[in-house]
Amino acid sequence: MDKLQRISEAIKSKKKLVVMFSGGVDSTLLAKLAREVLEKNAVALTIDSPVIPRKEIEEAKNLANLIGIRHEFIELNELKSRHLIENPPDRCYLCRKLRDNIVKNWARENGFDVIADGLNFSDLQDYRPGVKASTEDGIWHPFIEFEVTKEEIRDFSRKLSLPTWNKPAMACLCS
């Protein structure tokens, strides 16, 4: 069984899944897999924020439509958080905690127990305070669990004809 099959089986075992969906390479592949195995029990959840370019929000809408996954939005204005506008050294950690909290609340209110994101095995090579924050928050990282690298995600995405397979990485506007 290859990695994609193992991830699909793991997704299936979750019964219902919220995918934290940015419309990037990683979350698009994860949303596609979730939609294929869970059908209507998968939802892509996008945070709509002033720190996310409008173009990215529109692309996320289009990608979710292409995949056929239910797509929901949560509005968040990180710029209203005193802790974040002070720009502390751990702002990425704090921002991820804030985002995870609103996603967890949405999931709970809508009957979902499991939330997954597109963090991948290659992300562990960089300084990523969001990995620590989201792990603490109980967010599932299937691409890390199954040791799927960014290169593999691009390759799988290309094979599945996802238009994001060669999409460049997008840095956070707060960085």
Predicted regions located by residue number:
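ATP-dependent adenylation/nucleotidyltransferase module used to activate substrates
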Residues: M1-K159
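Histidine/lysine/aspartate-rich catalytic loop segments that bind and position anionic ligands
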Residues: T149, R158-S175
